[in-house]
Amino acid sequence: MQSHLELGEAEARLAIEACVAELRRRNKVGSIAVGDKHGELIALLRMDGASLPSSGIAANKVFTSSRLRQPSGALGRAALAEGWDVHYHGDIRYLGWDGGAPVFYREQCVGSVAVSGLTGVEDLEIAEIGVNAILATLD
């Protein structure tokens, strides 16, 4: 028998609150997405002033990170290094930009957090703050 864990609404709220707090601390705005282990959205927030495309990009980073169980930017780096298109995975939602971070709990990917609207480095830093906010409440 298999036991499956995945993020829910409560964890999504924690991650979004932590990411928003960090964005405000930096005087920045962006979009934050939290997805389940399949990469489907649980929650999405586009802060006032964030670019319109950032919400769709954050959602695609969540999809990529959860489905591949790795940071979203790893796909882009692999595609560049090996010379293939990220869409070879069969779904146009795969995205190779930094900013999506998987959440691992008990050796399982239970979902992911993504941020969009800043640089890739900043997006990933803030997404990881959301991941850590979730992990701090588990167990």
Predicted regions and their residues:
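Flexible, solvent-exposed loop/hinge segments and secondary-structure transition points
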Residues: 1-139
